[in-house]
């Protein structure tokens, strides 16, 4: 079956953690997400990248995905160490998608990315990346459906063509998950049983995985509030506390809760980290 991606518009930082007092946490990009922090979240206005769209992107929800996280221990989303597989770049170009995807009818966006600040060596893409133009001998495809430079020096600028969501385009048949991958994407830590009960209540009467996912998304959007105020004291079960007690939080709580609620229903899921939208000029 398919695995659902739940996007985090921005994630807790790692590289800047030592630059500020412990009671403050700066938003940014990281290869892990930590829940249950106390203090206050400060949104960073430091530009992370400049982008240029070469064709019309009207109506496109600009979500720049960096990587995905599948392991969750109750407080932290992370991935096991993954060396990935090389994708050779021939004459500055590499194909990232299978032929079936390349032949799929639907909308494409052609864009340029200029990375501006440290984001490890992660490459960011819209939608489903199909082709990249980059001044590097190779890039690395990770098991988490992401791409990185592998530590190689490159110009920090690249162009790409991506397939973007199009309701008129026929869906692809999702590849079958291995039993090992399915176990990872269904794993849930010990938590308040009310989380699974809430997931069943919210999705009652919904027959498909997609319908259940949309029901959970709608519930979180309409019944919970957004705040940058973090917890005043630590809790043992951050997801359960968010869903059943506090009912407000920042992006990490919404995405984590949706992914875990899906998993309690037997629907494989993981969170995708990156950035959403931006300033236009």
Regions found by a protein language model. Give the residues of each.
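Helix-boundary/low-complexity linker signature
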Residues: 1-281
């Amino acid at each position: 079956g398919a695995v659902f991606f739940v996007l985090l518009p921005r994630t807790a930082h790692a590289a800047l953690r030592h630059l500020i007092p412990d009671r403050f946490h700066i938003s940014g990009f990281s290869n892990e997400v930590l829940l249950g922090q106390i203090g206050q979240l400060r949104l960073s206005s430091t530009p992370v990248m400049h982008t240029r769209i070469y064709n019309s992107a009207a109506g496109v929800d600009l979500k720049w995905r960096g990587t995905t996280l599948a392991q969750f221990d109750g407080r932290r989303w992370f991935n096991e160490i993954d060396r990935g597989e090389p994708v050779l770049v021939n004459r500055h170009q590499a194909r990232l998608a299978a032929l079936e995807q390349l032949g799929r009818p639907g909308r494409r966006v052609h864009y340029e990315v200029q990375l501006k600040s440290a984001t490890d060596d992660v490459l960011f893409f819209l939608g489903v990346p199909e082709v990249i133009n980059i001044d590097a001998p190779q890039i690395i495809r990770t098991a988490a459906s992401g791409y990185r430079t592998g530590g190689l020096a490159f110009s920090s600028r690249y162009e790409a063509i991506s397939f973007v969501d199009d309701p008129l385009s026929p869906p692809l048949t999702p590849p079958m998950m291995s039993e090992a991958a399915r176990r990872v994407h269904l794993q849930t830590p010990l938590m308040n049983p009310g989380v699974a009960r809430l997931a069943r209540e919210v999705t009652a009467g919904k027959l498909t995985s997609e319908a259940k996912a949309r029901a959970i998304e709608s519930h979180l959007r309409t019944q919970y509030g957004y705040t940058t105020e973090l917890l005043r004291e630590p809790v043992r079960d951050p997801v359960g506390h968010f869903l059943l007690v506090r009912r407000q939080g920042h992006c990490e709580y919404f995405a984590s809760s949706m992914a875990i609620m899906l998993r309690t229903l037997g629907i494989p899921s993981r969170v995708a980290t990156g950035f959403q939208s931006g300033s236009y000029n």
